[in-house]
Amino acid sequence: MKRTAIALAGFAMFGVGVAQAADAAKGEEIYKQVCFACHDAGVAGAPKLGDKAAWKDRIAKGEATLDKHAIEGFTGEAGSMPPKGGRTDLSDEAVKDAVAYMLSTVK
């Protein structure tokens, strides 16, 4: 029991095996570098930053789905999203941070 508690404390301390929450503040920087190119102008059906109506149906699908579509890419009725906004060098976490930032502008 004592070893388990120590191991769990170590994992929590170093973030090993623990899902990290997306960071909207970090995501703002990614947005300004990458995402703005489509999401400021609504290119290819991209919902514009801060447009609650455009994001409503997407938000209803859940943040996990939005993260998946942003990371893997998506084509649907409302438009298309290239994987990682065309920047495949971005980490999945950076993309999730950018999604969190965009969602923070419409909640």
Each model region followed by its residue ranges:
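Local sequence-structure signature of Cys/Sec-based thiol-disulfide redox active-site neighborhoods
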Residues: 25-33, 44
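Sec/Tat signal peptide C-region and signal peptidase I cleavage site
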Residues: 5, 14-23
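Axial heme c-ligation environment in periplasmic c-type cytochrome domains
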Residues: 47-48, 68-95, 102-105
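Gly/Gly-Pro-rich "capping" loops immediately C-terminal to redox-active cysteine motifs
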Residues: 40-68
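Extracytoplasmic/periplasmic, Sec-exported soluble proteins
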Residues: 30, 58, 62, 87-90, ...
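Bacterial N-terminal signal peptides that target proteins for export
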Residues: 1-7
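The canonical Cys-X-X-Cys-His
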Residues: 35-41, 98, 102
